[in-house]
Amino acid sequence: METLRFAKVRDVKSPERGTAKSAGIDFFVPNDFFTTQLAPGDDLLIPSGIKVNIPEGYMLMGADKSGVATSKQAVVDTGRKPKEGAFMSPIVIGAKIIDEDFQGELHIHLINAGNFPVTIKPGVKIAQFILVPVDYCALEEVPADKLFTEVTERGPGCFGSTNIKGLINQSRSDRV
């Protein structure tokens, strides 16, 4: 098991796992961060107050907190009463990769992907980071016609192409 060494450089709660088997390590909004309203479509970089020494051969990958808006310590205040079981948070994490050779303070990139403003509050869980092994593969440029040695079942299909595979040979009226 690797150890992720960290240092606090601001007044912030130490990163922690929700449970012993949680993949993600929870990060908090620093206590000295001003309460901030984030408008729909806007983004924000929050200094985490944490520097990390990422072990050799690893990276940190940022991820959204699935329970952020449903927890009692909600990170966002939407001003709306949540529906039973609804996930209210429109906050997503951007700029997710932290390379092993980065030595500065981590910043958390928040994006309001919703259609209403949210309020970011100090002291609450905002994101999680996962320690992920990295394969530093070699890069080799080859001519496009030499790139693949066999044709796969998927081929050059794009996003969602496996869902429409059976529709390709149907007329439009047959698909409706």
What are these regions (language model features)?
Residues 1-176:
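DUTPase catalytic domain/fold
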